[in-house]
Structure formats: structure tokens, C-alpha cells
């Protein structure tokens, strides 16, 4: 008879203790509120308010949105121009802790590393953690966080559901949303976003939509960090099954020190695309197969029903992807669906960062990057013609050179550290203890 496995029991007890502690705190807070004098005095007003909510739901929604930060603070948060000194962190600790689910999409681990570099550039103490279970969270958490930042909550709480009961130890709870409003992943994330003290969103329009729903949200564009080496593509392209079709001279093509050091026309790959397969994308590439057959193109559409994990369901790594883009003249951006969106990862981190010119479908607003100044905007129908013009005409290549130079200047002139300082300062101004 096999003896019972008691190795996990202490960890299960830790989780139960955390849940009980949180429930006890909630109960004490509720009891304090029910016994307060203000609660008893406002009982008639609450009854009247409940009646009003039943007969006038539209007015209720208006009341909720009227309290949102739509004034100067929010507007300054979304479009800041002057330098803002960084306020001290709030909470018991003095660090920002960034958390991702280990089983989650590789993109979110990359974003976590970029955000961490931006914080370090700003002189803000921080740590990045990746956990696969509640046991991992409890083992790694050192209770020194003033802010706990959950990246991609739709994934984090899916893989670690017990984290909903994870005590904050007086830290503020922040979340980074990356999902578009029309996706089921956003619906899954919204439940958790409502519990956050602050939500950061890479998309400006999504930050505004969250504010309209009564959620304190700020825009955090994925900007430049000079200390982040994760996206360097200077190394030769790794020889893996996904790249074995590339000639050796392309894989080992030497890169100069700066992405703009060599002329765009000298790069050996004409265009590239990396993305998840969708009916829309597949139809575009199939319809233009003759065009791409005549180009030195690297196109990779992957079908997955699980998060992208390099080395598991993809043989490409971050470095391999960046090395291919670093050797490409054009990086294409095609939306997965008909809903427009600014794909920060593909356009900025995998495009502009490597000195390639990005040709993209029209996107949502994404300060500081502007269409036809920092990337070439073209409809799906016009994209083949624009691509041919850039690659096969001298005027088109000069235009592309001008756009990529402007994009590089925009990228390097706007630091992620500056944005972090602004966010911390704005949150400190708005913060009120709960």
C-alpha cells in the first residue's frame, strides 16, 4: 500500500491560511462598517439610491462615470510632455514586483523584462517573478512590494486561480491589460481588472474604455529602454528547423552596431511577418502568393490553441525572431481580425526597434508613433502595391528610409523610464487609502 504524499500539505496549509486571513480581514472591515455611525445615519439615503438604480439605470451609469479621472490628471497621464519627478512608492515595501504566469504567453515574459528595465532606468527598485503555482508565489514573495503588478491577469489567474486570495500585505494591486475589447480574453480579464487599484493598458483607446467603466486606468506605451538587451538582433540567426530554409549567408549576415548603420536596401531579407494564423491573415498571404514567391520573404503563421512558448510549441526564440527582423527591409503588420489595433509588440518591439520599416494596416492611436511618419499605413487591399513600390523602386526605398529614420528618432527620444516616473507620480497624487 502506497503511503500518502504529505510533501504538499504544508503548502496547501499556507494557501488555506492566506484565504482565511483575507476572509477574516474582510469580515472585520464589514463589521466595522456596519457598526459605524455614518452607516446608520445614511440608511434612508441608501434606500432611496437603490430605488433610483432600479428605475433609472442610465442615470446610475452616468453617476458612476462622472467620478472618473477625466480631468487634467487623466489627460496628462495619457499625453504627457514635460518631465515629472518620481514620487515615493506607497505601501509597506519599497519595490514594484512584476508577476507573470510561467505557463503563459512568451510575449508577456518579454513585456515584463522590458517594463523591469524601464523601472531600473528610472531608479525605481523592482523585481520580476514568474510563477507556475500558488506555491511558487508564496516561496518567491518576500513581502517587500509596495506595488504588486500582475501582467496579463486573464492568464495569471487562469493558471494560478488561488492567487485571488493572495494577501497583499498592504501593497497596492496593479494590473497590466493587453487584451482587445472584442476578445473573450478581455471578458476574462475584466473580472480581475475591477479589483485592481490601478490598471495599465498598452492601448490608449482601451485605457479610455476602462475609465468609462469606472476603472482607474492609465496608458503605458511600450517605449524605449537603452538597458534592455532582450530584443537585440545582432547575433546570427540560430540554426533551428524553423530557419533551416534560410541560406547560410543570410543567417550569418553581419550586423553593424546600430540598426540604422547600414542602408535599408542592403538588408538580405525583403520582408517578414510573424503571427498567429487566422482566416484573415491566411487569406491575405494566399491571395498574394505570387508576389511573395518573387521576394526573399520570411513569413511565419503558427496555429496554436495554447499560449506561445518558445522551445515548446515554437522552435523560434526571441533572439531568433529579432535576428530575422534585424536583417529584413520590411516588417508587415496585419491585424488578426477586422478590429483595428496597434500591435505594440510587432510594430515597435519587433519592428521599429530593429530599424526596419513597418508597413501596417491602419491602427488605433498610439502616441508617440504616427502613421506615415513612423510607419507606413496601408489598407489590406493596397498593401501589396505599397510593398512592391517600397522594394522595387528607388523612390519607394527613399521613402522607406525616411520613415524608418523618423521612427527610430521617435523611439529613442521617448523613454519608458520617463513614463514610469509619470505613472508613479500621478498615482501618488490620486491615491487614497482604502
Where are these regions (language model features)?
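Boundary detector for helix-to-coil junctions that initiate low-complexity/charged tails
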Residues: 1-77
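Conserved alpha-helical elements of sugar-nucleotide-dependent glycosyltransferases
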Residues: 12-15, 41-47, 104-115, 280-284, ...
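Short boundary motifs at domain starts and secondary-structure transition points
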Residues: 78-97, 137-141, 255-266, 322
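Extended catalytic core of nucleotide-activated donor transferases of GT-like folds
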Residues: 80-85, 95-215, 229
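Catalytic binding pocket for nucleotide-activated donors in carbohydrate/polymer assembly enzymes
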Residues: 90-104, 109-131, 187, 204, ...
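Short, solvent-exposed loop/turn segments at secondary-structure junctions
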Residues: 103-105, 133-135, 153-157, 178-182, ...
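Catalytic core of nucleotide-activated saccharide and alditol-phosphate transferases
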Residues: 104, 164-287, 293, 415
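Glycosyltransferase donor-sugar binding loop
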Residues: 296-311
